[in-house]
Amino acid sequence: MAKIDTTSRLTSLRGFMKERNVQVYIIPSEDSHSSEYIADCDARREHISGFTGSAGCAVVTLETAALATDGRYFNQAAAQLDSNWTLLKQGLQDVPTWQEWSAEQSSGGKNVGVDPSLISGATAKNLAEKIRKSGGAELVPIEGNLVDLVWGKERPARPSEKVIVQPDELAGESVTNKLTKLRQELEKKRSPGFLVSMLDEIAWLFNLRGNDIPFNPVFFSYAIVTPDVATLYIDDSKLDDKCRSHLSANKVEIKPYDSILDDARKLHASVSEKGKSENAAPTGNFLISNKGSWALKRALGGDSSVDEIRSPVGDAKAIKSEAELVGMRACHVRDGAALIQYFAWLEDQLVNKKATLDEVEAADKLEELRSQKSDFVGLSFPTISSTGANAAIIHYGPERGSCATIDPEAIYLCDSGAQYHDGTTDTTRTLHFGTPTEAEREAYTLVLKGHIALDQAVFPKGTTGFALDGLARQHLWKNGLDYRHGTGHGVGSFLNVHEGPIGIGTRVQFAEVALAPGNVLSNEPGYYEDGKYGIRIENIVVVKEIKTKHKFGDKPFLGFEHVTMVPYCRNLIDTKLLTSEEKEWLNAYNAKVVDKTQGYFEGDDVTLAWLKRETAQVE
């Protein structure tokens, strides 16, 4: 991973900071919609720092610069940041958060600047309080992004790809029904409206899909839903006649994307004016998501006029319709078949044919095999194809032309996924094509045991992913081992591969939302030896109600249904470490994989032989 000399970029940025009288400037990773994955034109933190990971925040003062990121990216950030930068390893003891570091730098009456469209209103409020307590001046909303000024004419144009309709038979629910349910939420809160800013929520709400952000079938847009009107803010050039007809049939108005702030101000003025009327019924505040930007909150009137809530659209989206669940099961079988073909091909090339393949060449083959499956649209994220020590970099990204050659005598980790019209996939398998060490086999088996434990979990309704996280880590913990990432994330239906608000892990938000039937999320424990190897095993699971002998407190009990259909690496399993119950689970899983996928391999002797060996009975 090459370092970029950021000296001139930082010098230029500091010049613009001085012009606006800010001594500290914050550059988040997200775009104006709080997206995790962003378009190239919004990669501001990457441009100023040289760090390409998907999560992190840069903070620049007139003398220093710091980059904060989490444990998934410690190795990558250390490799990519040049000497201008200090790495803040979030989550480690005595390491300040980027908010704390920003506030510390503001002491002595310094101003802290930020683009108000890139942080949430809640974050801005908390940060302003920290700045005040640290002796700083204030948090200043800087209209016009300063990194964009540094970037200049080299900044990529904003994408404007066409939008398509997601048919009701795949979505499982009409736009009209979704809007009716949202308006019922507004009525409960006596709210005059909800502003939707998350791109995947808008795509889901209006049964549309786009292609503005790589790997994520979303499109740049906002929406405002009131008791009477639903308005989609989108560039008109994105819509064809079919989309316009679809929106019209569902009584959705269309307005220009760039008019959202003006309309938000007008809405605030209108609601305020109505509230002054003697005969007006009392109303609550306008609603925005707690991930909605500070700019949107300010336009709607600020704290006194706006309530920031967990998005009811996001909550509804996380509980998949029956049609979406049917699609998720089906696409994971097709996707599993592609992965089985890939792993069989890769082993044949490396071991039998003694071929030389680098990480990207292998990933290209996997994409080719996936593209041959029905309803394939594209990848759901860049394939993590990693050999040996590269596998220890949790979100490693091989670079074409300069990546490593796959070593058959080292661990190979492949984390990959695809977008299909009927669902989104995300699967990780760790393999070894030679002779693994005892330490590697032990670590792999401990990870597998945690993976199985979570898959078999049964828990009462109301349980959160926060409460389940330890199940996946327990066998690692018993041996003094652990991993620095979450155990599970929500997955969209032909939408973002990372989807909130649910998840399994130690993040605070995972303790706030209980898992519910219809949730789709990942089960992906791991273990990483820096500079040596990495192990991760990932399946996608569906939350469902489980029949139990008793029902304590008259509560239903829930569990998981795995939909991923790919064998585990037989070469890395130390069966002596497995209990009889775990072996039984593994045999049942393997039998299901064979039953669901073998029909794809007629006449493919290499794949059939590989599948037979990898799914052989564990005694």
From Swiss-Prot:
GO terms for biological process: proteolysis. GO terms for cellular component: cytoplasm. It is an enzyme of class 3 (hydrolase). CDD domains: APP. Binds 2 manganese ions per subunit. InterPro entries: Creatin/AminoP/Spt16_N, Creatinase/aminopeptidase-like, Creatinase_N, Pept_M24, Pept_M24B, Peptidase_M24_C, Peptidase_M24B_aminopep-P_CS, X-Pro_aminopeptidase_P. It comes from the Eukaryota. Keywords: Aminopeptidase, Hydrolase, Manganese, Metal-binding, Metalloprotease, Protease. PROSITE patterns: PROLINE_PEPTIDASE. Its EC number is 3.4.11.9. Mn(2+) 2 binds at residues 415, 426, 538. Mn(2+) 1 binds at residues 426, 524, 538. It catalyses: Release of any N-terminal amino acid, including proline, that is linked to proline, even from a dipeptide or tripeptide. One of its GO terms (molecular function) is metalloaminopeptidase activity. The keyword Hydrolase applies. Belongs to the peptidase M24B family. Catalyzes the removal of a penultimate prolyl residue from the N-termini of peptides. This is Probable Xaa-Pro aminopeptidase P. It comes from Fusarium vanettenii (strain ATCC MYA-4622 / CBS 123669 / FGSC 9596 / NRRL 45880 / 77-13-4) (Fusarium solani subsp. pisi). The gene is AMPP.
